[in-house]
């Protein structure tokens, strides 16, 4: 299978995003405002203390900066399929000699690359200047963090892929996408560091894919997990990517059989 068409789709998506400069700057501003709010809330909660239950304020700030940084370019289009079902273009796209899912991924990766260069980098630069973050535990930890971040994006994308398949049976998937994103925000550790969750809640979250998106990469960066626990974190990410994709393709195959195009 030639990668050329998918590279072209990714390039097109990259260039399309570059046309919306105001949206780009507002996105950076939004991320920085959220970061300031989160940090100030926890500074108040810490009440001048440097550590609470072994969790330092520096660790909390690092968690927020890295999580929001990753979130800024972890781009998925939750409505890619539903929009094409609604306007009828799905019928034409499925006839093209390229994988529909490959095109979906390519479009998202093109946007993610744009966000990485023009959103993540400047946001992280400003955050480092005004807040500072802990250095990675070691060079290997930083490299493993990058690998885990890639797998974290894989979990996020696969989850979106699965939920998008419900578009075949629902006229509007906004409600379930909103619910999914609420769970991601709360349970991934980006909004509330999972260190502060009750142990029973952390164990329950551990059986879900949510902490594999942001929290696992951050834990690796900080050197909080190593050895068998580190290996388990990677295995868990790979398992969730596989499980979500398997169920996603099962729904895709069922949905194609009863495809009803809304619109023209």
Regions found by a protein language model. Name each.
Residues 1-264:
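Hydrophobic transmembrane alpha-helices and immediately adjacent juxtamembrane helices
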